[in-house]
Swiss-Prot record:
Gene name linked to the record: 3
Gene Ontology, cellular component aspect: host cell; viral tegument
Identification of the protein by name: Probable membrane antigen 3
Keywords: Virion, Virion tegument
Species: Saimiriine herpesvirus 2 (strain 11) (SaHV-2)
Lineage: Viruses, Duplodnaviria, Heunggongvirae, Peploviricota, Herviviricetes
SUPFAM superfamilies, per the entry: Class I glutamine amidotransferase-like, PurM C-terminal domain-like, PurM N-terminal domain-like
Annotated localization: Virion tegument
GO biological process: one example: intracellular transport of virus
Amino acid sequence: MLVLHFNLYEAQILPHERLATSVFLEHGPLQVTSFNPTTTTGYVVYVNSPNASFLEPVLSKLFQSVSPKLPFFKFSEQTLSFSYGPHLQGSQTTFSKDLVDVVKNLSMFTPQGPENAFTVERIEYYRTIHIICDLKDPKKRHIRHLQKMLCNPYTGLTNFVIPQDKRLEMDVLDAESAVSAPLSDPLWTMSNGLFNLLGYSSQYSVFKRGAAPKVFVEKNSRLAISMNIDYWNPWSSTNMLYDGLHAIEKGLIYSFGSFTPTPSLTSVFNMAQHWYVPMFSACQIGHVMQLPLQTHELSLTGSLPMKMLQAHLNLLKCSSMPHIQGFFRLVPKDLSHILPQTKIYNGFISTSLCLQTINMANEHPLQDKTYLYQLGNFFTYHKQFLTCQESGKEIGSILTALAFFLDSVKTYPGTIVGMSTSLPVASMKAKLAAVCQQVCGARLLVSALPPQVVAKLAPFSPSNRVENKKMLKQYFFNLLTSDLIIAIKNVNIDAQAALKTACYMAGCRFKKIGLLTHLKGTEVVDNTVERPYPILRFDRFKPKFPLLSSPTSITFLEERINWQDLNLRDTILKILEHPSVGCKEFIVNHTDKLISGRVARTSIVGPWQLPVSDYSILVPMHPCTTEEVRENPWDYETDIDSHCVFEEAAVAGICSAIGESTILTQADLKVGTIRAITEAILNLSMVPWNNIGNIVIQLSITLPYTAHVSTYLQLVMETAKTFCEALRVSCTFTANATEGGASIVASAIVNTLDVSKCITPDLKFNNSFLFLLTTEKDYSLFGSVAQQILEKTFIGEIPSATSPVMLKKMLSVLQTLIKDESVVSGHDVSDGGLVATVAEMALSGGKGVRVYVPHGEDAIKFLCSETPGVVIEVQGSKMYYVQQFLHSENINFQIIGESTSSLTFSISQNLTKLVHEPLELFKSAWRSFSDACEPCQIHPRPYRMQIATVPKYCPVGPCRFHTVIVYLLPNNSVPHGLLNAIEEAGFQPRLVSIHQPSKTTNVYDPHTVWGFFIVGASNVQDEDVGMRALIAQLKSHVAFQRDLRTMLAKPDVFSVAIGALACELLFYNKAIGYNKPSDTYMTCVKNSSRKFESRWSNIYIPESTKAIAFQSLKNSLIPCWTQGTHLKFYHPKPMLEKMEESGMVSSMFYGHSLSSGPAQNYPLTPNGENAIAGVCSADGRHLALLHDPSLCNNLWQWPYVPLENPPLKVSPWKTMFLDLHKWGITVQGASPPPSRTSDPLRSFVF
């Protein structure tokens, strides 16, 4: 194998590198230099070709587009250089997997034809730190220090040995191997009822065959909620997939969750309803962890648990699934021996069509050939190395391919015969068994096996039989992989062609690996030799389970806490500072919360944009007209305003919430189970629903695998079943075995008819009253945050279990109060107790509060008790009515305070003030942990809007002759929000996948196409390299570039690019920002934070802008969602000034009001420096935006709607899409056609 080496590319020093080298600076303990260290990057490329000379200049150009090369960089004798990166003889990193997948789609890499597409096998990058040692000579201890700080075992990085020659002949890399079969998860197997299936050996487990009923779903429970859902599929040149049109069908919404010890999303394949393929999924996440004792910035963010958190968030971002909710649980120090391991929770809220598309495999259908396909690459993933995890990009592409394929075969049930889901272990042999369902077998072809596996095999002969079987087990069957196996047969259609098309459009690797057979077990056939083909046979899958571990003893201390000795003010501040209670902006602001356009409620609410929401909302179907009308006004009218409306239609949604019980569960499984379910349901209590029976609870359980695990699991499920039956709600289960203590997460979903009626936690008015409603009268301090901060977590009495009767009654009362508009805000009582609940309501609403401790109550116990309940805000005019109503219903309640206009937090008892402090003090405490994770930022203030027009929209449906193309960039999910915004404006959207560079079919039709949108982002783990590689891929897409150039040249066609990757494509084609004298292009560069940003930004539309989409919005200041890693436009300063002077700046990041001016500080401008948020061409036809109006095209997508007079009833961003259609009406077919506007930037000399 040939190795190409590229080095000395400029790089910015990273925080952990700055920390590691700080000791080398002057006056440091290991001082050697008075200069700041510098860093460079390099790349090592493995090429499986004897002659790859054409690759060197192409790869060099690609890497230089990411960062400039330093050609004259020379090392002096006093320079200490230390390189670190992945071990070249070890596991392939996720970065390499993703980048190689992109590179293989570059036509420039395959000049000799498609057969050379697999020339590049691996691309790894490393970093080098250069230190000029002018004070002292470097010693070995300096190298050892850098190695200790930068080569942490959990990252998989090591002291990098740089090849001395650019071209080295090396042996073929050794494939990963697993000598013995991986152990299966016994709890997962039991909760799925898999012990009743043939082939599952009970001799390795404490569970006995037949003794464990299938309790995955209780017989009286339902799995899902049925609602209408809408979806889009891309246009395809085959007749198997539709023309990218909008479809509405009856669908199912369901939830599913599980725990893992490391960052992983593969459980998304193991849906609770795995026979329904998900059309769309959103993710809930949770982390249970310990943190190091030091809490300063670099030691905190560089710790293993926080690195795992960041890896998990990056994995989620790359999968194109929005993150809608989560929890963060810090393990108390006195329980560190019980919960030593990090636990990561993944929950999925998914939509599916109501079609049984997967039939169980059985022997009868095998009369027709049923083929096995592998979706995704055969890559092993390593739980111990964060750099070698599974690929989020690949997981997302598999899910997208399945959704596209489902739409093409939905009318042909039985097409999918089996799928590798619901697995006790993700080994290849287990996946094949799951597809076969233990009633048939699989025949695999040697020609379809991975090359690294085939390289290990000897010719199939009796003498080699034992060795070959050993190799196949060790290098194939026993390995944990992140791919998906699917069995398909043709049912009156060419299903295989449909799968191929769907995978191409989704950017998902696939190949045929074999077929199903009548013979049980697995056969491997060597079809590379002449017939008769030799065969190796393997027994069917028989999972083995780990040995039982010893239970960890839990000690309950008999000592008491003297609460009267504690200082109330200090105790409250410590509770708010606790990471389990405090602000989660360090997570929420750096995850993709909105990518699909279906998210109606994230965790961010209120004018202060704080993450305190109890629930999230997804909209399965956008409220737009899809039925074709006989006479569409867009066909014959030039003035469409008479058909416009000034209020958005109500939209139904699915509300989801989670409840978590880890600390309390260690002491009492039954109480912990009920507490998790109670919290999840109370988090939904502010959602108006019609019937409590519509709620579906999904309980995710993780227990240590000890001697009594079977009893414990049955206890948890029986407790949940009894409690849910009493509430009349449905309940489903999943279970996992993990090290350490138990954890239980309840995910609840319910449908609501109008998402705008849902109540948020932020206080709305001054002088309103706060009511506390509780499910029980006793204090709940055992295991509370108040006791955790004292390191006396398990002291006192374990709280009693919540009464389902009382909980149900309280929920019914709250629903009545919400529907008669007596409640204006509400928040559940959980971690941190009542004081944390009231503080979050005050902080998110920007209101002061006065809290009254009832006479005779202990103030600290009253305020810190975590008794399940809800605090509601009631205006003064409704106070007596609510009070009387609660009395009449025998609800436990107290009036515990009121809101005030003064920004103070006051606590009093019997007219004595116990605490009276500025609200800012409590906000600082609540934000302290988040600020420690990302310091040096200015927190946003409430935004003020200014709208230059009355927002309206025209709901008459799309005109089928006014087409707008929406290009779906590689490995991105379908932009439902954008498609519906375009359709709502009267256009007919046409979704086009451009993943295939070899595709030559043109999609532009000059008679019907009025414009095009490009939207998407890089889903490669390293954003810089990934984005440049994807741009190179799209530049080489012949048909796409041909259509793009044609449409850009048409004076009556508009274009809109949303996101950095899309903007780069317009810049590359010289549509915006090109300067001919200097031959410079505009470009997008990475945020100053070096992170993914998701911000609710204030956007100003300049009066001078020429953008046709913003003509009605000139001089408007409107908030909008902004997401991405590259949110900064770059051009030489004179060019940016010239663009602004010429009206080519279309939008700007602004402060909280017009008087604040353009934003200059992070995060008001998410990039940290530049205020420009959008640019346009000189004639205004072409628009490049870093913010995304399609994600806030409806008011229900806004985290907070500012109070206006009159109230805002239509999103102003609808005007943008309406203006585009109005412009098209005026220019399409105009005679003479629109004249070209000269671009002052083209000839500008600076």
